[in-house]
Amino acid sequence: MVKIRLRRAGRKKLPVYQIVAADARAPRDGKFLEVVGHYQPTAKPHVVTLDRERVAYWMQTGAQPTSTVRSLIQKTGLLYELRLKKLGRSEAEVAEEMEKWQEKQAERRQKRLNVKSRRRQLKKEAAAKPAVAEEVAAPVAAAPVAEAPVAEVEVVIAPEVQVEAAVEAVPEAPVAAAEPAPEVKAEEKEEGGEA
């Protein structure tokens, strides 16, 4: 079975991947059949280059992409194009649909960037608000406060009153010395027998 997957290249802490068609039993960086593209995850935005014809060929011959490669191929629109061709659409219809898809993706990307920039702007505003509040609070705290004269108040202490509460005496029921429980008797017998 053939897989379309990533093959690591590049140096330490700077990964660059080749997108390859390889036998599913081959190790990750081992033998492969063909290089069909490149992927650079460290670039901003990520760079994906595909040989669309070769990827389409391998997928039509039964090659299965891994989940990561599938998402990369999906972002380029190749999966959508292959699906349209499989449904029997003409080349003109496929080209028209792909153009619509590209526009839709551009709108999504722009919307996502707008949301990110709006969040950054709100964060900056929120960070600026406490600074403004501190600037306003500083002069208010430094302003001298006029103290009003305190009126003297006479404190009258009331004499102590003793109140005796009527406590009802509850007669306690006499505890009758009951016979020890049978378990206790059995234990006493065992102790006496051992000695």
Curated annotation (Swiss-Prot):
Tell me one GO molecular function of this protein: structural constituent of ribosome
Statement: the UniProt record of this protein carries the keyword Cell membrane: no
Q: What are the start and end residues of every segment in region (Disordered)?
A: 171-195
- GO annotation, cellular component aspect: cytoplasm; small ribosomal subunit
Listed disulfide bonds for this chain? none
Gene that produces this protein: rpsP
Organism lineage reads as: Bacteria, Pseudomonadati, Chlorobiota, Chlorobiia, Chlorobiales
Task: Print the keywords alphabetically.
Answer: Ribonucleoprotein, Ribosomal protein
* Record's protein name: Small ribosomal subunit protein bS16
* Family (UniProt): Belongs to the bacterial ribosomal protein bS16 family.
InterPro entries noted in UniProt: Ribosomal_bS16, Ribosomal_bS16_dom_sf
Report the PANTHER family cross-referenced here. Answer: 30S RIBOSOMAL PROTEIN S16 (PTHR12919), SMALL RIBOSOMAL SUBUNIT PROTEIN BS16M (PTHR12919:SF20)
Which SUPFAM superfamilies does the entry link to?
A: Ribosomal protein S16 (SSF54565)
Disulfide bond: present as a keyword of the record?
A: no
Chain intervals with Low complexity compositional bias? 171-181
Annotated GO biological processes are:
translation
